[in-house]
Amino acid sequence: QNALVDGLLYDWLTKPFIRDCYSSVKGRGTSDGLARLKLFMGEYYRCHGAEGWVLKCDIHHYFDSIDQSDVLRRAERYVSDARVMALLAKYVRLTSHGLPLGLRTSQPLANLELCEIDHRIKEVYRCRYYGRYMDDFYIIHSDKAFLKELRREIEAGLAAIGLRLNDKTQIFPLAHGIEFLGFRTYMTDTGKVVRVLRQTAKTALKRGIKRYEAMYRAGAAHGEIQQSYRSRRAHLMQGNCRGLMLRCDAKMEDIFKEENMNE
């Protein structure tokens, strides 16, 4: 799978992706998605001020709901080797419906499924302030009525491929901030863009530290746990949460210190 994705599929399947598709694209990811949101908010403020609206969308049971035949038809437009296409179809058909979770081939295919909608939002509706990470996406606009109409268009486009928005989808004032990729990003009245950690992410971090402690007591390697924690820490430090991270650092040190004292 790794050789298939890295050696062949990646270039073929990512070719039609828009700039603001962040998942499973080299050089992008969550950090890029957050940076682009900050850029968009700054640009929006300079053009329109602090008043505006956000359409925030999420798709119901995305991976499980993707039509296998439809996504394979889309892939055929870009995969020029019949043998590779046959192997890709074999991976997709490992489950009776949707895309198999955990397979590397599923990530670019899931992105490809929404590619036409991406282009329609960007190029037909001319939405500059649009970003998507897999099935989580937002549009910032000055006109609430425009976003209501756009939501109907998105719903129709999704229905045509057997998908639908979930109940979390909503239109709300830009002043509320946008929850995206584990953070809430908002603008002050003066146009300063601020990023803070979501409460759910804080809770997940605390649970993660308890899990690290249990892993360490069960015999997991110190280096393995530290590597996992550093990766999570690097992502969370993109928000305004230095105090929280310092407390978590101290807790991690205590875990290793207590174990060493008991040896």
PLM features: what roles do these ranges have?
Residues 2, 6-22:
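Electropositive, glycine- and tryptophan-enriched low-complexity nucleic-acid-binding patches
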Residues 2, 91-94, 148-149, 165-263:
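Right-hand nucleic-acid polymerase module
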Residues 4, 154, 158:
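PAPS/PAP-binding and catalytic site of the sulfotransferase fold
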Residues 6, 57-59, 183:
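Residues immediately flanking
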Residues 7-8, 12, 91, 141, ...:
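Generic structural signal for hydrophobic core residues of well-folded globular domains
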Residues 23-34:
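Long, hydrophobic, well-ordered secondary-structure blocks that form the structural core
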Residues 35-134, 138-155, 163-168, 172-173, ...:
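Conserved polymerase palm-domain catalytic core
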